[in-house]
Structures are given as C-alpha cells and as structure tokens.
C-alpha cells in the first residue's frame, strides 16, 4: 500500500507543479463550480479555486506526503496497523487539499475540521496516557479555531454568499469584513499555534515521527498561515495586522528561547517550527503575502527533512529522544548526519540553501520597513536564537563520543528510508533558488546601509557562538541555572503556557466549584435541614425494620419487658 500511495501522490504532485508553472507564467486563475444538488429553484454549488499559489502549495504537500509514506514503509515496518496509519495520512492530505483549493468558508471548514479530527487520530496512534493527553490538548485547542470559523460563516450570511474571495477587495473597509477577518485570524492563530495557543504544538510530538514530518512541515500548522494569506487584504488595511505582528513576534521569540533550554530532540524541532510559523505570520501581517508563501514552501522542505533525520536517529537510539545521550553520530550514521546538518543549516539561513533565500529577504524587507524598534529587535534576536539552538543541537548529537549504552549498534538506515531523505535533501539544496526565480522573476532593489546588510550575518555568527558556548559549558551553566531556577523554568517552559492553558484554565474554576459545594450544597444548612432529617428518619426506620424482621425471642423479651414495667407500675401505685 505504501508503494501504490507513493506513486499516485508523486504523480499528482508533478502534475500540480507543472500546472502551477503554466498558471504563473500566463497569470491565469481558474474557478470551477460544481453543482452538487439542484432542486426547483434551489441549488448547492461547490466552488474550487485553482491559481499558481494553490497548485504550487498542493504540489509541495503531495510531494512531502509521498516521501513521508515511502519513508514510513521502513519506519513503521514492525507496526501491525500500518495500513490504518497510511489511510489516516491519506485522509489528512485529502483534508489539506480541500482547504487549499476552497474559496468558500463552508468548504474550508470541511477541510479544517478534517485536519483537526485526523490529527487527533494520528496523535493518539501510540496508545498511552501521554498520547491521549496530547491528543485531547490538540483537539481542544483547535476547537476554539473551529468555533471562530463557524462564527465567521454565520457573519458572512450578511453578504448572501460564503465565497469570501469575491468580497475581500470590495468590502475591505467595512465593519462586517473586519469582524470576519478578526474571527478568521483567531482561527488561524489556533491552527498555527501562535500565542496564547502555543502549548499544543510541542505536545503533538507524541505522534509517530513520519506524522510529525508531515504535520509540522506542510499541512496542519501551515493551514492557518495559508488561510491568512488568502485574507491578507483585510490584515494589511486594519489594526489586525499590528496585533498579529505583536503576537507572532512574541511567539517567535518565546519558541527560540524555549528551544535553547530543551533536551528532547523532537521538541526542539517542534519549537523551531513554532518559531518559523511566527516568522511567516509576522511578515504576512506587514502585507508581504508572497514572501510569507515563499518561506512557507522553503520551510516545508527542510523541516520535513529535519524530522525524517530525527526519526532515523530515534529509530537507531532505541526510541530515545534525549540529545544528551547522543554524540558522535556523524561517525556512525554519515548519510543521516549529512542530511541532518544540511537541513539544520537551511534552517539557520546558510547561503544558497533553501532557507537562505526566504529568511534573508524577510530580514532585509524588515530592515527597510517602517516598524518599531521592539519588532525589529524580536526579528533579529529570534534569528540569533534559531542559529543558537541549531548549533547546540548539532554539537550534542554529532560531535564527541556516543553517550548512551556501549552495546548499541548504530548504522545508517536502510535505503528505503534514505531514499526519502535524499529526495528532500536535493529539494532543500535547490528548492530555495528555484522558488525564488519562479515567485520573484524580476529583481527587487533593496538599498540598505552596510551595517544593516551585515547585521544579519553578525546576528547569525553571534547566535552560533552562543549556542556552542552554552553547549560546551553545560555543567557550569547547569549550576548557574540552579541559582536562577524560577527564571530558567519560566524561559524553558514556554513562559508557563502549557500550565496556563491546561491546568491553569481549570484549577481555579474547579476549586471554586468545590468550595461552593462544600459551603452551600453540603454546608450547615443542609446538615441541619433536609439531609439531617433524612439521615435521622432513615436510621429510625432501619432500627424498626431490624426489630420487625428478627426472631421470636425478641418479641418474647419485649413481652416480658413490658409485663415487668406494668407490674412495677401497679406495685408503686
């Protein structure tokens, strides 16, 4: 089943890519209307939008999904339910495709809810308590976005149609469109895990690693970014863009800090995804939707590769994800290590890899844009933190000696897994330049002073040195961090967001409810009122019932007892 799915998906992906090139070069957009039901004067019509953006994004989703399924053939080989796993992944991709090609909020909701439902099934695929909790957190966080999307659909009834694409430019300054835009932004923030809905994304790492490679590169988390790209006109002409810039910038900063304190391999990569999602959202909020789309596509390539390499490492390390137990993997697993390092360097923005073209352009656009000093600081400091945790990850996993048990035998994975990784390695190297020439065919003139041009390079070098220094001085930094335990805990636990959004949301209401129950429902009024009366009467009834059902000797004893009382009464008279 893996091979058939791989061939079908890669064929459709290639077709979509060629069509997107044709549409892009000829500046074409196709609307296809399918009349689902026609009864008297009533008809239900489903509309599909095909332009270069939807087709290109769909081709990337299908390509990554095909390689992930091919990779899963070996990774999930020992799993008895691998066919169920492949079916879930295909349902996930189908939901994403429906969301991509829909210009209608109702059909978008079908794909949106499909993503949420199937992601829950995939997160709880390994059946244990941790997976169940992570799945419930993922589902409930995304429910908020679903409700926001339903409210946006209800508000669009004012227009008589749910095809938002026709109203964006005409109604962009109206209050009703602002309300719809704010609800859609809330939905996108939950799906793309922006503050304050960030806690579900690292928790979703309980899913199998191939799912993480698909979910955190091109499908679930990027659905919110893609939806906001479609609604970019409403964001760029209102205060919603400024609010989104603040929240996404803080998300980027928070995720970068958290990743530098984390030791779980998959969680570090998940936090880096969160940081890059904040980068996409922030540049989108400034009105550069093509640039956000560009970074979304390049990020999909190297992040899927990074997760695949992490899966291969975890597979070899007997399912251990602690980077402190790794080391010297470049000697034992050279091909996997090469892919891992290339994807890490692409994440840092190494020149001429996929991430360089989009990240460098974003930082240069930020430098010439009219934004405040705080946002400027968040952009560049977060970039430095990205390089820092990437170098820290490479240091712990690739250098030195192996820190786990000496009986472990490490080697590169079989060619089935390596072929999937090498396909994405090729795209991570050439994908950035290819997309740059396609999406931005004409050169942009960005005039910057020398110190601003060199600022990006300086921030990356300082970030890399910082990551290396905190890695080699781990014992010293551990002792120092214990002196500032509360600060370390705050920075390393995503600013207490997992506690606030889970335990913190229910602790005080439940505690207050328990107090109310004890004070009123089970308090003194109940004790001296109905409950006490019921308790006394039931006790008396039980005693009488016991006496009534007992043997004959009790009746005789009572008879003798009453006769004695009667005689004593008569004697004293």
UniProtKB/Swiss-Prot annotation:
Which protein is depicted? NADH-ubiquinone oxidoreductase chain 5
As for what it does, the entry says: Core subunit of the mitochondrial membrane respiratory chain NADH dehydrogenase (Complex I) that is believed to belong to the minimal assembly required for catalysis. Complex I functions in the transfer of electrons from NADH to the respiratory chain. The immediate electron acceptor for the enzyme is believed to be ubiquinone.
Q: A GO molecular function for this record? A: NADH dehydrogenase (ubiquinone) activity
| UniProt similarity note | Belongs to the complex I subunit 5 family.
Subcellular location per UniProt equals:
Mitochondrion inner membrane
Membrane topology, as annotated: Multi-pass membrane protein
Q: Which GO terms describe its biological process?
A: ATP synthesis coupled electron transport; electron transport coupled proton transport
Name the residues that span the membrane: 4-24, 44-64, 85-105, 106-126, 147-167, 170-190, 212-234, 239-259, 268-288, 294-314, 337-357, 377-396, 422-442, 452-472, 487-507, 552-572
List keywords of the entry alphabetically. Electron transport, Membrane, Mitochondrion, Mitochondrion inner membrane, NAD, Respiratory chain, Translocase, Transmembrane, Transmembrane helix, Transport, Ubiquinone
Q: Which GO terms describe its cellular component?
A: mitochondrial inner membrane; respiratory chain complex I
- Highest taxon of the lineage: Eukaryota
Which Pfam families does this UniProt record tie to the protein? NADH5_C, Proton_antipo_M, Proton_antipo_N
Entry EC number(s): 7.1.1.2
Enumerate the catalysed reactions: a ubiquinone + NADH + 5 H(+)(in) = a ubiquinol + NAD(+) + 4 H(+)(out)
- Per the UniProt record, the source organism is Drosophila yakuba (Fruit fly)
């Amino acid at each position: 089943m893996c091979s058939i799915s791989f061939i079908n998906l890669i064929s459709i992906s290639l077709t979509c890519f060629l069509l997107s090139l044709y549409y892009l070069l000829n500046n074409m957009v196709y609307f296809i209307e399918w009349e689902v039901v026609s009864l008297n004067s009533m008809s239900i019509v489903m509309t599909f939008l095909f332009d270069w953006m939807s087709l290109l994004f769909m081709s990337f989703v299908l390509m990554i999904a095909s390689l992930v399924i091919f990779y899963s053939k070996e990774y999930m080989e020992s799993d008895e339910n691998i066919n169920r796993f492949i079916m879930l992944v295909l349902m996930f991709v189908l939901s994403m495709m429906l969301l991509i090609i829909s210009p209608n909020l109702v059909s978008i909701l079908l794909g949106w809810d499909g993503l949420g439902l199937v992601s829950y099934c995939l997160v709880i695929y390994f059946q244990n308590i941790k997976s169940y909790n992570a799945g419930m957190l993922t589902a409930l966080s995304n429910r908020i976005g679903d409700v926001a999307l339903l409210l946006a659909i209800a508000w669009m009834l004012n227009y008589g149609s749910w095809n938002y694409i026709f109203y964006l430019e005409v109604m962009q300054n109206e209050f009703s469109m602002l309300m719809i835009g704010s609800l859609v932004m809330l939905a996108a923030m939950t799906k793309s895990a922006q503050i304050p809905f960030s806690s579900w994304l690292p928790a979703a790492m309980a899913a199998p690693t191939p799912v993480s490679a698909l979910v955190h590169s091109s499908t679930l988390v990027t659905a919110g970014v893609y939806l906001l790209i479609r609604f970019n006109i409403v964001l760029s002409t209102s205060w919603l863009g400024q609010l989104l810039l603040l929240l996404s910038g803080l998300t980027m900063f928070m995720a970068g800090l958290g990743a530098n304190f984390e030791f779980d391999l998959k969680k570090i990569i998940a936090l880096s995804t969160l940081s890059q999602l904040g980068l996409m959202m922030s540049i989108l909020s400034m009105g550069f939707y093509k640039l956000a789309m560009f970074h979304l596509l390049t990020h999909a390539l190297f992040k899927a590769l990074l997760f695949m390499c992490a899966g291969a490492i975890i597979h070899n390390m007997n399912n251990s994800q602690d980077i402190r137990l790794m080391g010297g993997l470049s000697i034992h697993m050279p091909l996997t290590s090469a892919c891992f390092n290339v994807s890490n360097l692409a994440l840092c923005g190494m020149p001429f890899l996929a991430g360089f073209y989009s990240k460098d352009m974003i930082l240069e656009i930020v430098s010439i844009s009219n934004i405040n000093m705080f946002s400027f600081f968040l952009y560049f400091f977060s970039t430095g933190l990205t390089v820092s945790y990437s170098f820290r990850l490479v240091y712990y996993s690739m250098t030195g000696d192996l820190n786990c048990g000496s009986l472990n035998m490490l080697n590169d994975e079989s060619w089935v897994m390596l072929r999937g990784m090498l396909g994405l390695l090729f795209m991570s190297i050439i994908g950035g330049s290819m997309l740059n020439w396609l999406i931005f065919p004409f050169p942009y003139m960005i005039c910057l002073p020398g110190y601003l041009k060199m600022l990006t390079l300086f921030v990356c070098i300082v970030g890399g040195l910082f990551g290396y220094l905190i890695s080699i001085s781990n014992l010293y930094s551990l002792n120092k961090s214990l002196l500032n335990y509360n600060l370390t805990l705050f920075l390393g636990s995503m600013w207490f967001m997992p506690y606030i959004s889970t335990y913190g949301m229910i602790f005080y209401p439940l505690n207050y409810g328990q107090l109310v129950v004890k004070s009123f429902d089970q308090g003194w009024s109940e004790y001296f009122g109905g409950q006490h009366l019921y308790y006394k009467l039931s006790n008396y009834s039980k005693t009488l019932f016991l006496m009534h059902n007992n043997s004959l000797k009790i009746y005789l004893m009572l008879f003798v007892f009453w006769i004695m009382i009667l005689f004593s009464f008569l004697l004293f008279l």
